[in-house]
Amino acid sequence: MARYTGPTCKLARREGTDLFLKSGIRSLDSKCNVTQLPGMHGANARRQKGTEYGLQLREKQKVRRIYGILEKQFRLYYKKASQKKGSTGENLLSLLECRLDNVVYRMGFGSTRAEARQLVSHKSILMNGLVVNIPSYQVSVNDEISIREKAKKQSRIQLALELAEQSTQPQWLDIDHKALKGVFKNVPARDELSSDIQEHLIVELYSK
C-alpha cells in the first residue's frame, strides 16, 4: 500500500499540532515549529480561522496522518465504524487503536507508528506466537504481541524502549519490556485517548 514519504514536519505544520510522527529523542519544538505554516512564506503567513467544512477537513486529515492511513482506507474504517453500535466517532478511534502497528507503537516497541509499521511489515512481530506482517491487522482482547527472537537486539527497538520508559504506560495494555512482549487487555475507552482529537468533526464531514 502506498504511503506518504515526504517531510513529516511539513504535515505537522500543516495541521498546526504534533502528529507524533517523530520520535521523542528531541522535543518537537527543536525539530519543527508547528505554529508556522509550511512553504517559503510560512514564517510570515497567518493561520486563518477557516470555514466549518475546512475545520472538519483539517480534523480528518490530522487523525488520518496521526495513524498514517491513506484516504481510501480511512473511509473504509469510517464506514465500518458507522455500522457498529454506539458512537461512530468513538468506534472509529477504537478501530484505529486496534491496528497492529498502533498497538506495537503503544507498547513502546517502535518510537513512531511508522517505525512500528515497518517492524510489522518486516516480520519482526509475533501475534500469539505467530508471525503477522499486516500492519492493519485488528488486534483482539487478550492477544499477545511480542518481538521475534532474531529482532530483539535491533538498536531501534532498544532505543524505542528507552523512550517508552520515560512515558506513562497505557492502562489497556499489559507490557513486559524486559521480555519484549505485551497483552492487549481491552479496547481503550474514549477518556483514555487524546482529548485533542475532535472525532465529531470527522463524523460531521462524512455525514454530508
From Swiss-Prot:
Keyword check for ATP-binding: no
Organism classification: Bacteria, Pseudomonadati, Pseudomonadota, Gammaproteobacteria, Candidatus Pseudothioglobaceae
Gene symbol of the encoding locus: rpsD
PROSITE patterns: RIBOSOMAL_S4, S4
GO cellular component, one term: small ribosomal subunit
Role according to the record: One of the primary rRNA binding proteins, it binds directly to 16S rRNA where it nucleates assembly of the body of the 30S subunit.
Oligomer and partners: Part of the 30S ribosomal subunit. Contacts protein S5. The interaction surface between S4 and S5 is involved in control of translational fidelity.
Sequence similarity: Belongs to the universal ribosomal protein uS4 family.
Segments forming domain S4 RNA-binding: 98-160
Coiled-coil regions listed in the entry: none
Stored HAMAP family: Ribosomal_uS4_B
Pfam families named in the record: Ribosomal_S4, S4
Stored InterPro entries: Ribosomal_uS4, Ribosomal_uS4_bac-type, Ribosomal_uS4_CS, Ribosomal_uS4_N, S4_RNA-bd, S4_RNA-bd_sf
Name of the molecule in the record: Small ribosomal subunit protein uS4
Paired cysteines (S-S): none
